[in-house]
């Protein structure tokens, strides 16, 4: 596991990997978008969730316990990262900090974000 820097909340939209690692065969990334963080896990090709769109989870009785639920699945994440199948979730829900929407909301330190990723990977 590598924590590159702490989450710094801003009003400017930026994209920066602030933590990354590998656990139990899953690569993972915590990305700051400036206004909020998101967590992503790369799903291996031999895993049952590979290429399953997150919008189909309910119909397939797939439940992943993460902050606000899975809100992303795609075969690409960011320039400079290997293509593959990624799932992810964001921290911009009701009660979460967002400079332009909820400036009084909760801010998440990178240690909490990494702990959340670890829990999801253990559940996968």
What is the meaning of each model-derived region?
Residues 1-124:
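Acidic interaction surfaces
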